[in-house]
Amino acid sequence: MDQTCEDAFALFRRCISIGVVDYLLQQAQMKVRRSIYTAQVVIWLMILQRLQPRGTLATGVEALLTGAADGLLSGCERARQKRISHRTGGYSHARQRLPKRLCWQVMAELVLRLREMLNPEGGRLSYLLDGSSLELEATPSLRQAYPPGENQHGRAHWPVLRIVVFHELETGLAEEPHWGPMYGTEAVSEQYLAEKAMDALVPGSILVGDRNFGVFSIVWAAHQRGLQVVVRLTAERARKLAGGPITEEGERPVKWTPSRFDGRRQGGMPEGAFVPGRLIAVRIGRGKSKEWLYLFTTAELPREQVLALYGKRWNIETDLRSLKRTVQLHHITARNESMMEKELLTAIGAYNLVRAVMALAARRHNLSPRQLSFTFVLNVINASWHRLQSAPDAEAYQREVFRLLDAAAEGVHPKRKKRRSFPRAAWHRRHTFPARKESR
Protein backbone atom coordinates (compact mmCIF):
# COMPACT_ATOMS: atom_id res chain seq x y z
CA MET A 1 0.00 0.00 0.00
CA ASP A 2 1.19 3.50 -0.82
CA GLN A 3 2.81 5.04 2.26
CA THR A 4 0.93 8.31 1.69
CA CYS A 5 -2.32 6.37 2.02
CA GLU A 6 -1.37 4.17 4.94
CA ASP A 7 -3.99 1.89 6.42
CA ALA A 8 -5.57 3.68 9.40
CA PHE A 9 -5.87 0.43 11.36
CA ALA A 10 -2.16 -0.30 10.94
CA LEU A 11 -1.32 3.22 12.09
CA PHE A 12 -3.45 2.85 15.22
CA ARG A 13 -1.96 -0.50 16.09
CA ARG A 14 1.55 0.81 15.44
CA CYS A 15 0.95 3.69 17.88
CA ILE A 16 -0.42 1.24 20.45
CA SER A 17 2.24 -1.40 19.77
CA ILE A 18 4.05 -3.23 22.54
CA GLY A 19 7.29 -1.31 22.00
CA VAL A 20 5.66 2.15 22.05
CA VAL A 21 3.51 1.50 25.13
CA ASP A 22 6.35 -0.21 27.01
CA TYR A 23 8.62 2.76 26.26
CA LEU A 24 6.01 5.22 27.57
CA LEU A 25 5.52 3.11 30.70
CA GLN A 26 9.27 3.00 31.35
CA GLN A 27 9.59 6.76 30.80
CA ALA A 28 6.88 7.28 33.41
CA GLN A 29 8.62 4.74 35.69
CA MET A 30 5.57 2.48 35.65
CA LYS A 31 5.66 -1.30 35.88
CA VAL A 32 5.31 -3.22 32.60
CA ARG A 33 2.89 -6.12 33.11
CA ARG A 34 3.13 -9.39 31.20
CA SER A 35 -0.42 -10.72 31.06
CA ILE A 36 -3.30 -11.09 28.62
CA TYR A 37 -4.72 -7.65 29.32
CA THR A 38 -1.60 -5.53 28.90
CA ALA A 39 -1.90 -1.76 28.52
CA GLN A 40 -1.75 -1.85 24.71
CA VAL A 41 -4.42 -4.57 24.50
CA VAL A 42 -6.74 -2.70 26.89
CA ILE A 43 -6.43 0.60 25.00
CA TRP A 44 -7.13 -1.10 21.66
CA LEU A 45 -10.14 -3.00 23.06
CA MET A 46 -11.56 0.17 24.61
CA ILE A 47 -11.33 1.86 21.19
CA LEU A 48 -13.01 -1.08 19.44
CA GLN A 49 -15.63 -1.25 22.18
CA ARG A 50 -16.69 2.33 21.38
CA LEU A 51 -17.27 1.40 17.74
CA GLN A 52 -19.80 -1.31 18.59
CA PRO A 53 -23.54 -0.53 18.87
CA ARG A 54 -23.79 -1.87 22.43
CA GLY A 55 -20.28 -1.02 23.56
CA THR A 56 -20.26 -3.31 26.61
CA LEU A 57 -17.28 -4.99 28.27
CA ALA A 58 -18.46 -8.27 26.78
CA THR A 59 -18.07 -6.89 23.25
CA GLY A 60 -14.49 -5.95 24.07
CA VAL A 61 -13.70 -9.45 25.35
CA GLU A 62 -15.35 -11.08 22.34
CA ALA A 63 -13.29 -8.86 20.03
CA LEU A 64 -10.15 -10.14 21.78
CA LEU A 65 -11.28 -13.76 21.40
CA THR A 66 -11.91 -13.31 17.67
CA GLY A 67 -8.34 -12.07 17.14
CA ALA A 68 -8.83 -8.30 17.06
CA ALA A 69 -5.73 -7.75 19.22
CA ASP A 70 -3.54 -10.72 18.23
CA GLY A 71 -0.66 -8.49 17.13
CA LEU A 72 -0.65 -6.72 20.49
CA LEU A 73 -0.70 -9.73 22.83
CA SER A 74 2.32 -10.18 25.07
CA GLY A 75 4.43 -13.31 25.32
CA CYS A 76 2.72 -14.70 28.43
CA GLU A 77 1.80 -18.40 28.29
CA ARG A 78 -1.99 -17.95 28.45
CA ALA A 79 -1.90 -15.41 25.61
CA ARG A 80 0.27 -17.69 23.43
CA GLN A 81 -2.02 -20.67 24.01
CA LYS A 82 -5.18 -18.54 23.60
CA ARG A 83 -6.49 -19.67 27.00
CA ILE A 84 -8.65 -16.56 27.42
CA SER A 85 -11.89 -16.58 29.40
CA HIS A 86 -15.15 -15.18 28.04
CA ARG A 87 -15.76 -13.51 31.41
CA THR A 88 -15.26 -9.76 31.69
CA GLY A 89 -13.68 -9.59 35.17
CA GLY A 90 -10.06 -9.59 34.00
CA TYR A 91 -10.73 -6.95 31.36
CA SER A 92 -12.61 -4.79 33.87
CA HIS A 93 -9.75 -4.88 36.40
CA ALA A 94 -7.20 -4.15 33.66
CA ARG A 95 -9.19 -1.08 32.60
CA GLN A 96 -9.11 0.19 36.16
CA ARG A 97 -5.32 -0.38 36.40
CA LEU A 98 -4.62 1.37 33.09
CA PRO A 99 -2.65 4.58 33.83
CA LYS A 100 -4.59 7.69 32.83
CA ARG A 101 -1.36 9.43 31.86
CA LEU A 102 -0.60 6.65 29.39
CA CYS A 103 -3.99 7.16 27.71
CA TRP A 104 -3.17 10.86 27.28
CA GLN A 105 0.23 10.07 25.74
CA VAL A 106 -1.08 7.42 23.35
CA MET A 107 -3.99 9.58 22.19
CA ALA A 108 -1.65 12.56 21.65
CA GLU A 109 0.62 10.32 19.55
CA LEU A 110 -2.37 9.09 17.53
CA VAL A 111 -3.55 12.63 16.77
CA LEU A 112 -0.03 13.63 15.69
CA ARG A 113 0.40 10.62 13.38
CA LEU A 114 -3.09 10.98 11.90
CA ARG A 115 -2.43 14.66 11.23
CA GLU A 116 0.77 13.69 9.36
CA MET A 117 -0.99 10.92 7.43
CA LEU A 118 -3.98 13.03 6.35
CA ASN A 119 -1.91 16.16 5.63
CA PRO A 120 1.38 14.80 4.19
CA GLU A 121 2.23 18.09 2.45
CA GLY A 122 2.08 19.94 5.77
CA GLY A 123 -0.34 22.57 4.48
CA ARG A 124 -2.06 25.07 6.75
CA LEU A 125 -4.98 23.56 8.65
CA SER A 126 -8.22 25.18 9.77
CA TYR A 127 -10.05 24.13 12.93
CA LEU A 128 -13.65 24.47 14.01
CA LEU A 129 -14.07 25.54 17.61
CA ASP A 130 -17.06 24.73 19.81
CA GLY A 131 -17.95 23.27 23.16
CA SER A 132 -20.56 20.89 24.51
CA SER A 133 -21.62 19.08 27.67
CA LEU A 134 -21.58 15.39 28.61
CA GLU A 135 -23.70 13.59 31.20
CA LEU A 136 -21.96 11.42 33.81
CA GLU A 137 -23.02 8.71 36.23
CA ALA A 138 -24.49 10.00 39.49
CA THR A 139 -21.89 8.53 41.86
CA PRO A 140 -20.75 10.47 44.95
CA SER A 141 -17.24 11.06 43.59
CA LEU A 142 -18.44 12.30 40.20
CA ARG A 143 -21.16 14.47 41.74
CA GLN A 144 -18.48 16.11 43.86
CA ALA A 145 -16.02 16.64 40.99
CA TYR A 146 -18.65 17.62 38.41
CA PRO A 147 -21.66 19.02 40.32
CA PRO A 148 -25.13 18.81 38.72
CA GLY A 149 -26.90 22.00 37.75
CA GLU A 150 -29.30 23.84 40.04
CA ASN A 151 -32.31 26.11 39.58
CA GLN A 152 -35.24 27.43 41.62
CA HIS A 153 -36.69 23.90 41.82
CA GLY A 154 -33.57 22.35 43.35
CA ARG A 155 -30.53 20.38 42.26
CA ALA A 156 -30.48 18.09 39.23
CA HIS A 157 -29.50 14.43 39.47
CA TRP A 158 -26.83 13.89 36.81
CA PRO A 159 -23.31 15.37 36.99
CA VAL A 160 -22.40 17.41 33.91
CA LEU A 161 -19.01 17.87 32.28
CA ARG A 162 -18.13 20.75 29.94
CA ILE A 163 -15.84 19.84 27.05
CA VAL A 164 -14.11 21.70 24.21
CA VAL A 165 -12.64 19.90 21.18
CA PHE A 166 -11.06 21.36 18.05
CA HIS A 167 -12.16 19.61 14.84
CA GLU A 168 -10.12 19.90 11.64
CA LEU A 169 -12.34 21.64 9.11
CA GLU A 170 -11.83 19.36 6.09
CA THR A 171 -11.59 15.90 7.70
CA GLY A 172 -13.41 16.35 11.02
CA LEU A 173 -10.42 14.88 12.91
CA ALA A 174 -10.66 15.73 16.62
CA GLU A 175 -7.70 17.15 18.51
CA GLU A 176 -6.98 16.52 22.20
CA PRO A 177 -10.08 17.30 24.28
CA HIS A 178 -10.11 19.55 27.33
CA TRP A 179 -12.82 19.48 29.95
CA GLY A 180 -13.90 20.63 33.39
CA PRO A 181 -16.97 21.10 35.62
CA MET A 182 -19.91 22.93 34.08
CA TYR A 183 -21.47 23.92 37.40
CA GLY A 184 -20.33 24.54 40.96
CA THR A 185 -17.63 26.70 42.48
CA GLU A 186 -14.92 25.20 40.22
CA ALA A 187 -16.90 25.62 36.98
CA VAL A 188 -14.87 26.51 33.90
CA SER A 189 -15.91 28.39 30.77
CA GLU A 190 -15.63 27.22 27.17
CA GLN A 191 -13.26 30.12 26.54
CA TYR A 192 -10.91 28.93 29.29
CA LEU A 193 -10.90 25.38 27.91
CA ALA A 194 -10.39 26.64 24.36
CA GLU A 195 -7.26 28.54 25.41
CA LYS A 196 -5.81 25.35 26.91
CA ALA A 197 -6.67 23.36 23.78
CA MET A 198 -4.80 25.85 21.56
CA ASP A 199 -1.45 24.68 22.92
CA ALA A 200 -1.60 21.47 20.83
CA LEU A 201 -2.17 23.23 17.49
CA VAL A 202 0.49 23.97 14.88
CA PRO A 203 1.32 27.71 14.61
CA GLY A 204 -0.22 29.24 11.50
CA SER A 205 -3.45 27.25 11.82
CA ILE A 206 -6.77 29.08 11.51
CA LEU A 207 -9.46 28.89 14.21
CA VAL A 208 -13.11 29.34 13.22
CA GLY A 209 -15.55 30.16 16.01
CA ASP A 210 -19.03 31.56 16.59
CA ARG A 211 -20.07 34.55 18.71
CA ASN A 212 -19.36 32.66 21.93
CA PHE A 213 -15.66 32.76 21.00
CA GLY A 214 -15.70 36.18 19.37
CA VAL A 215 -14.16 37.81 22.45
CA PHE A 216 -10.80 39.48 22.98
CA SER A 217 -9.43 36.82 25.35
CA ILE A 218 -9.73 34.11 22.68
CA VAL A 219 -8.31 36.31 19.92
CA TRP A 220 -5.41 37.39 22.14
CA ALA A 221 -4.62 33.81 23.22
CA ALA A 222 -4.58 32.66 19.59
CA HIS A 223 -2.42 35.63 18.55
CA GLN A 224 0.13 34.82 21.28
CA ARG A 225 0.40 31.23 20.01
CA GLY A 226 0.87 32.21 16.37
CA LEU A 227 -2.65 31.11 15.40
CA GLN A 228 -5.02 32.99 13.11
CA VAL A 229 -8.74 33.44 13.75
CA VAL A 230 -12.04 33.89 11.97
CA VAL A 231 -14.64 34.61 14.65
CA ARG A 232 -18.13 35.99 14.54
CA LEU A 233 -18.93 39.09 16.60
CA THR A 234 -22.11 40.29 18.24
CA ALA A 235 -23.60 43.46 16.76
CA GLU A 236 -22.65 45.48 19.86
CA ARG A 237 -19.04 44.28 19.86
CA ALA A 238 -18.72 44.91 16.12
CA ARG A 239 -20.07 48.45 16.54
CA LYS A 240 -17.56 49.22 19.29
CA LEU A 241 -14.72 47.74 17.25
CA ALA A 242 -15.71 49.84 14.23
CA GLY A 243 -16.01 52.98 16.34
CA GLY A 244 -19.63 53.59 15.38
CA PRO A 245 -22.69 52.18 13.57
CA ILE A 246 -22.07 49.92 10.55
CA THR A 247 -24.40 50.82 7.70
CA GLU A 248 -22.61 49.41 4.65
CA GLU A 249 -21.15 46.06 3.67
CA GLY A 250 -17.40 45.82 3.38
CA GLU A 251 -14.22 45.39 5.40
CA ARG A 252 -11.93 47.70 7.32
CA PRO A 253 -8.63 47.30 9.19
CA VAL A 254 -9.03 47.51 12.97
CA LYS A 255 -6.92 47.23 16.12
CA TRP A 256 -8.82 45.24 18.74
CA THR A 257 -7.96 46.42 22.24
CA PRO A 258 -9.40 44.90 25.42
CA SER A 259 -12.10 46.63 27.38
CA ARG A 260 -11.62 47.26 31.07
CA PHE A 261 -13.63 44.10 31.72
CA ASP A 262 -11.34 42.03 29.47
CA GLY A 263 -8.27 43.48 31.17
CA ARG A 264 -9.55 42.66 34.63
CA ARG A 265 -10.26 39.05 33.75
CA GLN A 266 -6.94 38.51 31.96
CA GLY A 267 -4.48 39.56 34.64
CA GLY A 268 -1.40 38.53 32.60
CA MET A 269 -2.28 40.78 29.68
CA PRO A 270 0.34 43.53 29.16
CA GLU A 271 -0.58 47.18 29.14
CA GLY A 272 -1.41 48.40 25.64
CA ALA A 273 -2.23 44.90 24.36
CA PHE A 274 -4.00 44.80 21.00
CA VAL A 275 -4.57 42.46 18.06
CA PRO A 276 -4.53 43.86 14.49
CA GLY A 277 -7.01 42.43 12.03
CA ARG A 278 -9.95 43.12 9.77
CA LEU A 279 -13.63 43.64 10.52
CA ILE A 280 -15.87 42.23 7.78
CA ALA A 281 -19.57 43.12 7.62
CA VAL A 282 -21.97 41.52 5.13
CA ARG A 283 -25.70 40.90 4.82
CA ILE A 284 -26.72 37.25 4.64
CA GLY A 285 -30.05 35.55 4.00
CA ARG A 286 -32.80 36.19 1.49
CA GLY A 287 -35.46 38.85 1.14
CA LYS A 288 -36.80 40.28 4.37
CA SER A 289 -34.95 37.65 6.44
CA LYS A 290 -31.53 39.16 5.73
CA GLU A 291 -29.34 39.90 8.73
CA TRP A 292 -25.88 41.26 9.39
CA LEU A 293 -22.88 38.98 9.76
CA TYR A 294 -19.86 40.51 11.50
CA LEU A 295 -16.52 38.69 11.36
CA PHE A 296 -13.14 39.54 12.84
CA THR A 297 -10.15 37.86 11.23
CA THR A 298 -6.38 37.97 11.47
CA ALA A 299 -5.99 35.67 8.44
CA GLU A 300 -4.51 37.22 5.31
CA LEU A 301 -7.18 35.82 3.02
CA PRO A 302 -9.55 37.53 0.57
CA ARG A 303 -12.94 38.44 2.01
CA GLU A 304 -14.71 35.78 -0.08
CA GLN A 305 -12.44 33.05 1.32
CA VAL A 306 -12.98 34.24 4.88
CA LEU A 307 -16.76 34.13 4.39
CA ALA A 308 -16.54 30.68 2.79
CA LEU A 309 -14.41 29.48 5.69
CA TYR A 310 -16.93 30.67 8.27
CA GLY A 311 -19.73 29.19 6.16
CA LYS A 312 -18.36 25.73 7.01
CA ARG A 313 -18.60 26.35 10.75
CA TRP A 314 -21.90 24.46 10.99
CA ASN A 315 -19.98 21.19 10.39
CA ILE A 316 -18.92 21.29 14.05
CA GLU A 317 -22.54 20.62 15.02
CA THR A 318 -22.63 17.31 13.14
CA ASP A 319 -19.12 16.46 14.39
CA LEU A 320 -20.28 16.83 18.00
CA ARG A 321 -23.42 14.83 17.23
CA SER A 322 -21.31 11.97 15.85
CA LEU A 323 -19.01 12.14 18.85
CA LYS A 324 -21.82 12.19 21.42
CA ARG A 325 -24.43 9.92 19.85
CA THR A 326 -22.80 7.61 17.30
CA VAL A 327 -19.74 6.94 19.49
CA GLN A 328 -22.05 6.99 22.56
CA LEU A 329 -20.26 9.70 24.50
CA HIS A 330 -23.40 11.63 25.48
CA HIS A 331 -23.58 9.67 28.76
CA ILE A 332 -20.37 8.15 30.13
CA THR A 333 -21.17 5.12 32.29
CA ALA A 334 -17.86 5.01 34.20
CA ARG A 335 -18.39 5.31 37.94
CA ASN A 336 -15.21 7.10 39.02
CA GLU A 337 -13.30 10.09 37.71
CA SER A 338 -10.20 8.23 36.53
CA MET A 339 -12.19 5.67 34.52
CA MET A 340 -14.41 8.40 33.12
CA GLU A 341 -11.40 10.27 31.73
CA LYS A 342 -9.96 7.11 30.17
CA GLU A 343 -13.33 6.34 28.54
CA LEU A 344 -13.48 9.88 27.15
CA LEU A 345 -9.98 9.72 25.68
CA THR A 346 -10.44 6.32 24.04
CA ALA A 347 -13.81 7.44 22.65
CA ILE A 348 -12.01 10.31 20.92
CA GLY A 349 -9.58 7.71 19.55
CA ALA A 350 -12.47 5.61 18.20
CA TYR A 351 -14.04 8.68 16.60
CA ASN A 352 -10.73 9.59 14.94
CA LEU A 353 -10.34 6.06 13.57
CA VAL A 354 -13.64 6.44 11.69
CA ARG A 355 -12.65 9.95 10.53
CA ALA A 356 -9.33 8.60 9.22
CA VAL A 357 -11.08 5.88 7.21
CA MET A 358 -13.47 8.51 5.80
CA ALA A 359 -10.54 10.73 4.77
CA LEU A 360 -8.65 7.85 3.09
CA ALA A 361 -11.79 6.64 1.29
CA ALA A 362 -12.50 10.17 0.09
CA ARG A 363 -8.91 10.61 -1.13
CA ARG A 364 -9.05 7.31 -3.02
CA HIS A 365 -12.26 8.33 -4.83
CA ASN A 366 -11.57 12.08 -5.26
CA LEU A 367 -14.28 13.12 -2.80
CA SER A 368 -14.39 15.45 0.15
CA PRO A 369 -14.47 13.66 3.53
CA ARG A 370 -17.42 15.88 4.45
CA GLN A 371 -19.45 14.25 1.65
CA LEU A 372 -19.45 10.91 3.50
CA SER A 373 -21.80 9.79 6.26
CA PHE A 374 -20.09 9.10 9.59
CA THR A 375 -22.64 6.44 10.60
CA PHE A 376 -22.46 4.74 7.20
CA VAL A 377 -18.66 4.45 7.39
CA LEU A 378 -18.83 3.21 10.99
CA ASN A 379 -21.20 0.43 9.91
CA VAL A 380 -18.84 -0.50 7.06
CA ILE A 381 -15.92 -0.71 9.51
CA ASN A 382 -17.87 -2.97 11.88
CA ALA A 383 -18.92 -5.22 9.00
CA SER A 384 -15.33 -5.49 7.73
CA TRP A 385 -13.59 -6.49 10.97
CA HIS A 386 -13.84 -10.24 10.47
CA ARG A 387 -12.39 -10.07 6.94
CA LEU A 388 -9.47 -7.90 8.07
CA GLN A 389 -8.70 -10.24 10.97
CA SER A 390 -8.91 -13.41 8.87
CA ALA A 391 -6.67 -12.17 6.04
CA PRO A 392 -3.98 -14.89 5.61
CA ASP A 393 -1.18 -12.60 4.41
CA ALA A 394 -0.22 -8.97 3.80
CA GLU A 395 -1.47 -9.01 0.20
CA ALA A 396 -4.90 -10.31 1.20
CA TYR A 397 -5.05 -7.78 4.03
CA GLN A 398 -4.28 -4.96 1.59
CA ARG A 399 -7.10 -6.12 -0.70
CA GLU A 400 -9.52 -6.09 2.23
CA VAL A 401 -8.44 -2.57 3.23
CA PHE A 402 -9.06 -1.31 -0.31
CA ARG A 403 -12.38 -3.13 -0.31
CA LEU A 404 -13.31 -1.37 2.93
CA LEU A 405 -12.32 2.04 1.53
CA ASP A 406 -14.35 1.43 -1.64
CA ALA A 407 -17.40 0.47 0.42
CA ALA A 408 -16.97 3.50 2.70
CA ALA A 409 -16.83 5.81 -0.33
CA GLU A 410 -20.37 4.74 -1.27
CA GLY A 411 -21.77 6.46 1.81
CA VAL A 412 -22.14 9.85 0.11
CA HIS A 413 -24.79 12.18 1.51
CA PRO A 414 -27.70 12.70 -0.92
CA LYS A 415 -27.66 15.91 -2.93
CA ARG A 416 -30.96 17.58 -2.06
CA LYS A 417 -32.32 20.43 -4.14
CA LYS A 418 -33.55 22.16 -1.00
CA ARG A 419 -31.66 22.03 2.26
CA ARG A 420 -33.71 20.54 5.08
CA SER A 421 -34.55 22.71 8.07
CA PHE A 422 -35.54 21.42 11.48
CA PRO A 423 -37.01 23.55 14.29
CA ARG A 424 -35.07 23.46 17.56
CA ALA A 425 -37.76 21.53 19.43
CA ALA A 426 -38.17 18.06 20.90
CA TRP A 427 -41.16 15.77 21.28
CA HIS A 428 -42.37 15.46 24.84
CA ARG A 429 -41.82 12.01 26.36
CA ARG A 430 -44.62 10.80 28.62
CA HIS A 431 -43.43 8.96 31.73
CA THR A 432 -45.45 6.25 33.45
CA PHE A 433 -43.73 6.79 36.78
CA PRO A 434 -43.44 10.09 38.65
CA ALA A 435 -40.16 12.02 38.39
CA ARG A 436 -37.67 11.41 41.20
CA LYS A 437 -36.62 14.46 43.18
CA GLU A 438 -33.72 13.00 45.20
CA SER A 439 -31.31 10.05 45.40
CA ARG A 440 -32.07 6.96 47.44
Question: Which residues are covered by each model-predicted region?
Answer:
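Short helix C-cap/helix-to-loop transition motifs enriched in small/turn-promoting residues
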Residues: 70-71, 100-102
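Major-groove recognition helix of helix-turn-helix-like DNA-binding domains
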Residues: 74-98
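Single, function-defining residue in the core of a domain
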Residues: 1-59, 63, 95-98, 105-109, ...
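DNA-recognition alpha helix
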Residues: 56-80
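Noncatalytic, basic helical substrate-engagement surface that gates or grips nucleic-acid strands
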Residues: 87, 128-129
